[in-house]
């Protein structure tokens, strides 16, 4: 095991000099004793002359030139398998929940090759989420990739927690949650939410939060993914939740300049597309098992053309766009039904009835959007009878797209609802065909199925 010495420390980037004949490989892990703590470094570049440039996987406070560094001769390895379920780990797979050792039987390196083309499988099976607007407008495929796009504070994390709760309880599969650069409070809330719903023993939690050095945030997504790959290769259907994929990009940006790379557009790293591709190509389903992934994507300044969200778009099967405008109307989940898309929304996959209902809902909402200007200037009375009907139905649809969440019961004060796809289609089809024209629009706000709206109308 070769030993080197630290020659330079710039924030999270540490240069280490090794003997010429024992230079570590790129992505190898190095270990340094920093006071009474072990610090792991990951090799990023070989600079020549026996010097390697590394990223620290923890705080580099207290490091100084001349400290001895050991080459571990393998990439960072993390525990995988059932021992990780119900545990909270950091980027190195070390437990941070004070429940003792993980006690794993196997450790895998976090840098792995993506499955080959022959191993990939293609499934057209739908995954029901119990959230009306998602099941209707942008259905998820089993083994597909979903992105939750939204600016700050429109509900990405709450939507993700609801999805985990619904899928864990209704589908009873294993899930892996990677918290990448998000708030520690959310991680804490999430853990308690999972414990209260008795699904914690089906979830592995990996966190690299906002206060961590960029090395942690850059690699924690790979740590979570590696654990998910192990479950997949055992022949299971596993769910991988990443909150937030934008922080993964941001961590890369933070160290990119320190690694000596020229920045590209908007100051992002020049390797943005490649780094995203390396991660996304591994999140895939093989003939042995599937990984269905849901990734929250922060959209800087609500601009979907920013290079980071724009690069992520290309890899996804379904995009759920959360809109500040809809959130401001008090409609939660604040999913924009006109902006959200899914490759599964095809009559050959979801069936003709589902497809027609979804497209019908979109056309009514689109027409309402066009009429809004006229209403704002001239008022409702200037509209034709036909347009008045469209507006009335559109407003009912808009309210019916809202839904009380289980994980938000403390905020909304109303119990959460899980709505089956069959009930969702029946409800929206009924509104479009005018079966509920006689009900007031308030009856449709924050209810589950259409039957609840009818019941609510009787009490109004």
From Swiss-Prot:
Quaternary structure and interacting proteins, as annotated: F-type ATPases have 2 components, CF(1) - the catalytic core - and CF(0) - the membrane proton channel. CF(1) has five subunits: alpha(3), beta(3), gamma(1), delta(1), epsilon(1). CF(0) has three main subunits: a(1), b(2) and c(9-12). The alpha and beta chains form an alternating ring which encloses part of the gamma chain. CF(1) is attached to CF(0) by a central stalk formed by the gamma and epsilon chains, while a peripheral stalk is formed by the delta and b chains.
Originating organism: Citrobacter koseri (strain ATCC BAA-895 / CDC 4225-83 / SGSC4696)
EC number, UniProt record: 7.1.2.2
Protein's name according to its UniProt entry: ATP synthase subunit beta
Organism superkingdom: Bacteria
Keywords, ordered alphabetically: ATP synthesis, ATP-binding, Cell inner membrane, Cell membrane, CF(1), Hydrogen ion transport, Ion transport, Membrane, Nucleotide-binding, Translocase, Transport
Keyword Translocase: yes
SUPFAM superfamilies linked to this entry: C-terminal domain of alpha and beta subunits of F1 ATP synthase, N-terminal domain of alpha and beta subunits of F1 ATP synthase, P-loop containing nucleoside triphosphate hydrolases
Annotated family: Belongs to the ATPase alpha/beta chains family.
SMART domains: AAA
A Pfam family matched in the record: ATP-synt_VA_C
Gene3D superfamilies tied to this protein: 2.40.10.170, Bovine Mitochondrial F1-atpase, Atp Synthase Beta Chain, Chain D, domain 3 (1.10.1140.10), P-loop containing nucleotide triphosphate hydrolases (3.40.50.300)
Name of the gene: atpD
InterPro entries on file: AAA+_ATPase (IPR003593), ATP-synt_VA_C (IPR055190), ATP_synth_F1_bsu (IPR005722), ATPase_a/bsu_AS (IPR020003), ATPase_alpha/beta_chains (IPR050053), ATPase_F1/V1/A1_a/bsu_N (IPR004100), ATPase_F1/V1/A1_a/bsu_N_sf (IPR036121), ATPase_F1/V1/A1_a/bsu_nucl-bd (IPR000194)
Purpose: Produces ATP from ADP in the presence of a proton gradient across the membrane. The catalytic sites are hosted primarily by the beta subunits.
Source species taxonomy: Bacteria, Pseudomonadati, Pseudomonadota, Gammaproteobacteria, Enterobacterales
Ranges annotated as spanning the membrane: none
Subcellular location: Cell inner membrane
UniProt topology in membrane: Peripheral membrane protein
Gene Ontology, cellular component aspect: plasma membrane; proton-transporting ATP synthase complex
Entries under NCBIfam families matching the protein: atpD (TIGR01039)
Top enzyme class: translocase
Signal peptide interval: none
Annotated catalysed reactions: ATP + H2O + 4 H(+)(in) = ADP + phosphate + 5 H(+)(out)
Keyword Transferase: no
List of residues binding ATP: 150-157
Gene Ontology MF terms: ATP binding; ATP hydrolysis activity; proton-transporting ATP synthase activity, rotational mechanism
S-S pairs: none
């Amino acid at each position: 095991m070769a030993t080197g010495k630290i020659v330079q420390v710039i924030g999270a980037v540490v240069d280490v000099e090794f003997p010429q004949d024992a230079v570590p490989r790129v992505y190898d892990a190095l270990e340094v004793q920093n006071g009474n703590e072990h610090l792991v470094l990951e090799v990023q570049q070989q600079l020549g002359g026996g010097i390697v440039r590394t990223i620290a996987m923890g705080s580099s406070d207290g490091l100084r030139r001349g400290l001895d560094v050991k080459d571990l001769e393998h990439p960072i390895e993390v525990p995988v398998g059932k021992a990780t379920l119900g545990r909270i780990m950091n980027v190195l797979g070390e437990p941070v929940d004070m429940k003792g050792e993980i006690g794993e039987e196997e450790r895998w390196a976090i840098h792995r090759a993506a499955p080959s083309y022959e191993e990939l499988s293609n499934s057209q099976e739908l995954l029901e989420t119990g959230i009306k607007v998602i099941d209707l407008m942008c259905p998820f495929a089993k083994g597909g990739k979903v992105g939750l796009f939204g600016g700050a504070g429109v509900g990405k994390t709450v939507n993700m927690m609801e999805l985990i709760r619904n899928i864990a309880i209704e589908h009873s599969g294993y899930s892996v949650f990677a918290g990448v650069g998000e708030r520690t409070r959310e991680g804490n809330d999430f853990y308690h939410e999972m414990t209260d719903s008795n699904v914690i023993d089906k979830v592995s939690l990996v966190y690299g939060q906002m206060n961590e050095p960029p090395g942690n945030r850059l690699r924690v997504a790979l740590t979570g993914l590696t654990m998910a790959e192990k479950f997949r290769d055992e022949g299971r259907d596993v769910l991988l939740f990443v909150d937030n994929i934008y922080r993964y990009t941001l961590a890369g940006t933070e160290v990119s300049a320190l690694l000596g790379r020229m920045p590209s557009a908007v100051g992002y790293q020049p390797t943005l597309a490649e780094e995203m591709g390396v991660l996304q190509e591994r999140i895939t389903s093989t003939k042995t098992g599937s990984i269905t992934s849901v990734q929250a994507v922060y959209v800087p300044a609500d601009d979907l053309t920013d290079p980071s969200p724009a690069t992520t778009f290309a890899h996804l099967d379904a995009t759920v766009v959360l809109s500040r405008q809809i959130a401001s109307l008090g409609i939660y989940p604040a999913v924009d039904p006109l902006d959200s898309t899914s490759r599964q929304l095809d009559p050959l996959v979801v069936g003709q009835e589902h497809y027609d209902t979804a497209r019908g809902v979109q056309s009514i909402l689109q027409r309402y959007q066009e009429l809004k200007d006229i209403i704002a200037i001239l008022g409702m009375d200037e509209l034709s009878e036909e347009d008045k009907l469209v507006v009335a139905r559109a407003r009912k649809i808009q309210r019916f797209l809202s839904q009380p969440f289980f994980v938000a019961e403390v905020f909304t004060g109303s119990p959460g609802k899980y709505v089956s796809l069959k009930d969702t289609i029946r409800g929206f089809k009924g509104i479009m065909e005018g079966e509920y024209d006689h009900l007031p629009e308030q009856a449709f706000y924050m209810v589950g199925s259409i039957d609840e709206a009818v019941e609510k109308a009787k009490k109004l």
